[in-house]
Amino acid sequence: MRKIRLTIEYDGTNYHGWQIQKNAKTVQEVIQKALSKLLGEDVGVTGCSRTDVGVHAYGQVAHFLTDSKIPGDKFSYAINNLLPDDIVIKNSEEVPEEFHARYSAKGKKYRYLIYNSPHASAIMRNRSCHVRPELNVAEMQKAAGYFKGEHDFLAFQATGGQVRSTVREIYGMEVYVKEDNMISIEVSGNGFLYNMVRIIAGTLIYVGMGKLHESEIPGIIAGLDRTKAGKTAPAQGLYLVQIYY
């Protein structure tokens, strides 16, 4: 059997996340059906990140096994012909047997977009979080610095997370203003807890609004109390940008 790695981009608006669920359309299910149709057999696809409802991806990674003779780099073209416009296979390649989309990953990079304007955006409504009050980006940038390094991020895990350890390392976090009232939070690390990036984004929004002071962040991290951090920011602002191997 050959192992094929896929790099996938998708708009998560119309999907109930990545992972297959009963009675709900998911990205994994749509890709598996396309592959099964292409190859004429049932195909299982294993993804790296189980993105939630409404979350988008530029660089989701998945793998599948096949006996097909199709060249590894040609699968992307063949599968894309069978996929809806909001899911695109950006790259496909044959990889060694020991590669695993999830367990071989060394880290991930996420982006969270905030549309900071008194008026909502018709175009970006499903691709960013709308915040009306003007945010103090300088304070958000100061606050972001406290997250870097290895910490116990229990205060930034949503209910339902099931992991042995809540310690994670953040490699980098940047907050900057893009064009057209858009603020971007970029964060990379060796792993993330359930809803961790969205809770960090919600906390930085609180700092930008003045509901929290940037100097309070170390205490919130050390306190391990979810109620002290900000609200979980909406899913539509979150993007899985890249997975590191």
UniProtKB/Swiss-Prot annotation:
Q: What are the positions of the active site?
A: D52 (nucleophile)
Catalysed reactions, as listed in the record: uridine(38/39/40) in tRNA = pseudouridine(38/39/40) in tRNA
Q: Using the chain's own numbering, where are the disulfide bonds?
A: none
The EC number(s) given in the record are 5.4.99.12
Q: Which GO terms describe its biological process?
A: tRNA pseudouridine synthesis
Q: Does the keyword Nucleotide-binding apply?
A: no
**Sorted UniProt keywords:** Isomerase, tRNA processing
**Record's Pfam families?**
PseudoU_synth_1
Under InterPro entries, the record lists: PsdUridine_synth_cat_dom_sf, PsdUridine_synth_TruA, PsdUridine_synth_TruA_a/b_dom, PsdUridine_synth_TruA_C, TruA/RsuA/RluB/E/F_N
The entry's substrate-binding residues are: Y110
Q: Name the enzyme's class.
A: isomerase
Q: Which family does it belong to?
A: Belongs to the tRNA pseudouridine synthase TruA family.
* Quaternary state and interactors: Homodimer.
Cited function: Formation of pseudouridine at positions 38, 39 and 40 in the anticodon stem and loop of transfer RNAs.
What this protein is called in its record is tRNA pseudouridine synthase A
Provide the species name.
Ruminiclostridium cellulolyticum (strain ATCC 35319 / DSM 5812 / JCM 6584 / H10) (Clostridium cellulolyticum)
Q: What is the lineage of its organism?
A: Bacteria, Bacillati, Bacillota, Clostridia, Eubacteriales
